[in-house]
């Protein structure tokens, strides 16, 4: 994901992609998200106040590499001298202060921009845990089965169970499924 991060007084165009952890591991022999994630952002996603300065320098180096457009350019053009010239344009704590925003680019990839196509069906009563267990038992799912399925599986089973009540003009055969 490409984004602009404000570091000090300057906006820096940064590319946060799958190459970042690979490059980081190749150079520093450490896990990128473990090092950076545990050093800069706490469990609530807030900026930590105590930050390892080595991790800041390493992250700044990765950021510098990610300002270059392609992975080939990174391998061909990024040198220590180039990095020192680039990082000297910033104040000492600029990177530490921007780490939450920088890490936000990486964590933003987990978010979705998709919105649901259908509105949730209005029911007469709220969907409680007891109602969920009742519907699961009606569909033939035992309490011990709930340990093996995730919520998506259960909802799929419940949807298929409710579809069983419908009558269809034609039911697919094994031959139809094989052709599909």
Language model: regions and residue ranges:
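Juxtamembrane transmembrane-helix boundary signature
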Residues: 60, 67-68
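Charged interaction scaffolds used for protein-protein
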Residues: 1-11, 18-26, 30-50, 54, ...
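Elongated alpha-helical scaffolds
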Residues: 54-62
């Amino acid at each position: 994901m490409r984004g602009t991060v404000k570091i000090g007084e300057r906006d820096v165009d940064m590319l946060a992609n799958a190459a970042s952890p690979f490059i980081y591991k190749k150079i520093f022999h450490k896990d990128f998200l473990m090092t950076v994630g545990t050093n800069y952002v706490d469990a609530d996603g807030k900026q930590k106040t105590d930050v390892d300065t080595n991790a800041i320098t390493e992250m700044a180096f990765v950021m510098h590499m990610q300002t270059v457009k392609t992975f080939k350019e990174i391998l061909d053009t990024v040198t220590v001298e180039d990095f020192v010239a680039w990082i000297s344009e910033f104040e000492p704590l600029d990177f530490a202060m921007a780490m939450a925003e920088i890490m936000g680019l990486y964590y933003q990839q987990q978010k979705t921009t998709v919105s649901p196509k259908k509105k949730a069906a209005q029911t007469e009563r709220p969907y409680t845990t007891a109602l969920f267990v009742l519907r699961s038992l009606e569909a033939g799912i035992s309490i011990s089965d709930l340990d093996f399925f995730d919520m998506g599986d259960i909802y799929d089973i419940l949807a298929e169970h409710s579809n069983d009540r419908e009558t269809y003009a034609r039911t697919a055969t094994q031959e139809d499924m094989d052709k599909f």
